């Protein structure tokens, strides 16, 4: 209900702790950190994060972000134990200190917050940020780590458990038909497996959802970000002073999603959830949600996506290098039709589109229900004569001319009007494509659905092999019937075909029915 949703603002601002002077062995050593990378594991985990805000940063910000990313990816994929600093009589664990370089401390803290929210696979990171100075007086910063994740062995067990759950959930998401279906399944999985609670050990982290099924808005949003990015749906997290939610890019436009406020469950209602805050605009808000969904002012430096629509618009821009492919491509159709593409790219619209452009057209893949390249090729002899087996050219012709000309692009499963002209000679008097492939299955198998290559075979080989090209001309009969031709051509079989084409038919000579001389 509204009253309950209004209270679901459990995001906690980072606790920034000045730990003073750092020991020499606490200063960063990035070459060593990067050498500890498990490349395969790092590649696996990278897909759960987002580089959207990273792409908006300055060079110095990117340098610090990358160093902090490397330290935490090493911590995630390795089994070293966390470092710690003692402050106020308590140990504060961290994943490793990194120099902030030329950045001021406030900017470095903003970058660190973005890194944590953009990489929820770093589930071990808590709400603390530690900073200190090295012997040169330069600032170093580290992300805090939950006490229960500080031991390398115990953390490895947690990581493995999270990986197994993510693999299962992502497989369920990828099994859905369309991009919107996949996004909704990511939303619903969280609804089915998590309860809003501030009592969990990891309630500010994706680990709250993945390990305990208990989290606040930060855990909901960061888990949704993980699941969507894993299947190729670009998703980021954004915060107000006390709330965290998502922005999702679908069909080229951004939409706001708030899984936390869609979750209406309490101890009595079980699995009740809705879609009130699912794919809406920034302005979709009531009195209490305006302040909850207003991004903190510091986000303005990083181009937070703007969400303008309250309903998903599935028509997107399929322009690439000056060509509009929308008449031959729809991403949902492509992913639904080809499981191998979906397995490779999930719901990543851009990768699926680029596959279609770079590979799919050449392979003859169907990108939209209203255009089948084989049907288009089968139906139009003029195009086959122009393009042959260059399948890509048929798509481009339909885009540039065919659709406007009203040409039909579906429904023709076979060639019904095969070409009969080869090197300027019309062989229709002695050849018919449909007859030839029906009579000679070996030819049909050698040149499937290819009337041009089939005619070429007839001209260069078939005539010499005395193959019959249509029902009106049998070279054996023509040979048997006409002594003048036998005297002129002997066993030069192709000459009989050419004679009939050039003279015999016009002279009224008969091309069938004579079984012997």
State each model region's role.
Residues 1-177, 290-322:
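N-terminal accessory/pre-domain segments preceding catalytic cores
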Residues 99, 191-201, 212-213, 262, ...:
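Repeated polar recognition positions within modular binding domains
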Residues 104, 206-220:
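A short, highly charged nucleic-acid-interacting micro-segment common to nuclease
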Residues 154-209:
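Secondary-structure boundary elements
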Residues 188-198, 218-229:
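Secreted/periplasmic proteins that engage bacterial cell-wall peptidoglycan
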Residues 197-207, 214, 235-242:
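Catalytic cysteine-centered active-site loop
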Residues 219-286:
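Hydrophobic/aromatic-rich core segments of domains that either
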Residues 320-517:
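Charge-rich, low-complexity intrinsically disordered regions
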